[in-house]
């Protein structure tokens, strides 16, 4: 049994409960174990999670492998049922009401998806290079993601973390690179869409993304083919033409430089297709597809942002990107959160002495924004201690995943790691104003039984698989 991970888990649970006490405390409260208060309810869920963890450790580890697909199917059916019978709670239909208990199936679908992926990828016939296998992996990840995104965007985005596990298991690096490029294209394209280059009618966002596409295409030719001549032709030719076009636009006749870039992109793609046919190498053709896909994503992301996203989602993104300052609206949570953290100073104001949190200036201060309670009451020292505990947990998960004797254990371990990383980075980023507010909890800290049980199940299934790793060779 990996006792280091269990000790870190217990410490996070304890610190998390005290943070819930601090975030939900009212001056009239006298008893933290009053089960009518959030602190009291969280205590009950913690005790239940200990019992749940114990049961998971007592089960035979082969059961998780044996029933992986059944668990996945069961949770997917529960997600479908949730769509139709869940009541409207704060504009979200993602909770099932079972008497006095409310459960969020999306939290439990994470471990089910991780088990299904581990089961499928541990099959003897599985190979990442097989396109049918890749389609099946995409289905296992995207199906719950699509079911959840109908009700809650934040919980659905967590499933993108599984691609980090896929990269560890041999997914081509270009796929991960494409995902990173998509984020960069979206941010740059949206952020600088209305900003022009000097005195020209050229939007910086569109120009910058198309320039990156041209440079990336040339760079990929060098990385994958080690051919200097086509690399020089693509990068050098593009930069030379754009320099001449800029000088003409600046000093002769102003025009949109993006028009020139469209022509350059067409020429580069045509050149890559020519190289692919003449040298009979598919790599050139795939690089051309990457360029076309990048251009398509640029213009479709603009449509997605303006036509698909809800107005409040657009405002949240604009606030994060510095395009708007809505301190009384969409930016209120983040602004108050940063004030609370900043007011904590080095050592904090002390347990239950936070003014921003006690006076309820920070909405969701014991759920999604609970880290601001830690920052205000425990200061920089306490916040650093909490982050160090999470760092120890992350490093331990990597070590335990790497020592697995079977693909099933390793894949599941890296799935757990990926989910924890996503939650940690996005939640802390939300509180600090570095990422959009998408409403996902901080593991073991945020108030709520569903998230606590979901993370406990994720972790303790992995610990049980690890305990039996020598029998899974």
Features from the language model and the residues they span:
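Alpha-helical membrane-protein architecture signal
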Residues: 139, 330-334, 347, 363, ...
């Amino acid at each position: 049994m990996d006792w280091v991970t269990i000790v870190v888990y217990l410490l996070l649970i304890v610190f998390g409960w005290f943070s819930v006490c601090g975030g939900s405390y009212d001056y009239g409260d006298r008893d933290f174990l009053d089960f009518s208060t959030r602190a009291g309810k969280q205590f009950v869920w913690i005790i239940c999670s200990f019992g749940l963890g114990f049961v998971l450790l007592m089960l035979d580890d082969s059961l998780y492998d044996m029933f992986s697909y059944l668990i996945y199917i069961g949770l997917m059916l529960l997600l479908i049922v949730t769509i139709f019978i869940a009541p409207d709670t704060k504009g979200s239909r993602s909770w099932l009401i079972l008497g006095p208990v409310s459960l969020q199936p999306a939290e439990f679908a994470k471990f089910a998806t991780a088990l299904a992926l581990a089961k499928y990828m541990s099959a003897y016939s599985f190979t990442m290079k097989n396109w049918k296998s890749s389609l099946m992996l995409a289905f296992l990840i995207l199906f719950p993601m699509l079911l959840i995104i109908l009700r809650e965007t934040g919980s659905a985005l967590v499933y993108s973390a599984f691609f980090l596990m896929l990269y560890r298991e041999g997914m081509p690096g270009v796929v991960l690179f494409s995902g990173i490029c998509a984020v960069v294209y979206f941010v740059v394209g949206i952020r600088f869409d209305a900003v022009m280059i000097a005195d020209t009618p050229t939007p910086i966002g569109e120009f910058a993304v198309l320039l990156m596409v041209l440079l990336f295409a040339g760079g990929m030719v060098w990385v994958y083919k080690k051919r200097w001549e086509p690399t020089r032709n693509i990068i050098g030719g593009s930069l030379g033409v754009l320099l001449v076009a800029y000088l003409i636009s600046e000093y002769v006749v102003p025009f949109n430089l993006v028009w020139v870039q469209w022509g350059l992109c067409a020429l580069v793609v045509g050149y890559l297709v020519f190289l692919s046919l003449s040298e009979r190498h598919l790599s050139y053709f795939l690089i051309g597809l990457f360029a076309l896909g990048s251009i398509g994503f640029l213009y479709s992301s603009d449509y997605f942002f303006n036509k698909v996203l809800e107005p409040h989602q657009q405002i949240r993104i604009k606030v994060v990107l510095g395009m708007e300052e809505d301190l009384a609206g969409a930016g209120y949570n983040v602004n108050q959160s940063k004030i609370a953290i900043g007011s904590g100073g080095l050592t904090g104001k002390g347990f239950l002495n936070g003014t921003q949190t006690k006076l309820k200036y920070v909405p969701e201060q014991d759920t999604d924004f609970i880290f601001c309670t830690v920052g205000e009451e425990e200061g920089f020292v306490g916040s650093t201690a909490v982050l160090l505990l999470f760092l120890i947990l992350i490093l331990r998960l990597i070590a335990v995943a790497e020592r697995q004797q079977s693909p099933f254990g390793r894949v599941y371990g890296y799935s757990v790691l990926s989910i924890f990383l996503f939650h940690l980075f996005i939640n802390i980023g939300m509180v600090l104003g570095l990422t959009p507010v998408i409403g996902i909890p901080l593991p073991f800290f945020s108030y709520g039984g569903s998230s606590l049980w979901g993370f406990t199940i994720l972790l303790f299934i992995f610990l049980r698989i690890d305990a039996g790793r020598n029998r899974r060779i």
